[in-house]
């Protein structure tokens, strides 16, 4: 699967219910959406980093920078047969697991579309209901 480009978008999201943790309460979130484009298809994933470095040292802003400055140059214009190949190319990027995972998940989505199977099948699922 050849990766032609990566697009990053920030989306505001109001939560249906206030989310309370030991780090505080959230009603609104910033979402980083990662889109991989390849072979006429699009793969999507959400980066799960938060706005502040509380739960993790990664944030929406650091993930954006890492994907744009370090991940994209390692994957755009290259072909990967499997997610493992993609992760091998990204192995030198250390300490930014949420950023790398978002790109990996977008690749899984892209690959499932290329295989014309649901993502749960591409990930090895066997049953429709759990």
Region spans (language model):
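N-terminal capping/lid subdomain adjacent to the active-site entrance of alpha/beta enzymes
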Residues: 1-130
């Amino acid at each position: 699967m050849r990766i032609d480009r990566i697009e990053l978008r920030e989306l505001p999201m109001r939560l249906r219910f206030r989310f309370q943790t030991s780090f505080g309460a959230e009603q609104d979130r910033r979402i980083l959406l990662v889109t991989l484009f390849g072979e006429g298809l699009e793969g999507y994933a959400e980066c799960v980093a938060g706005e502040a470095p509380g739960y993790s040292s990664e944030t929406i802003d650091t993930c954006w920078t890492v994907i744009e400055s370090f991940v994209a140059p390692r994957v755009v214009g290259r072909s990967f047969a499997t997610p493992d190949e993609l992760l091998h190319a990204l192995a030198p990027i250390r300490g930014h697991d949420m950023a790398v995972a978002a790109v990996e998940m977008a690749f899984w989505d892209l690959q499932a579309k290329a295989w014309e199977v649901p993502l749960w099948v591409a990930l090895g699922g066997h049953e429709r209901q759990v």
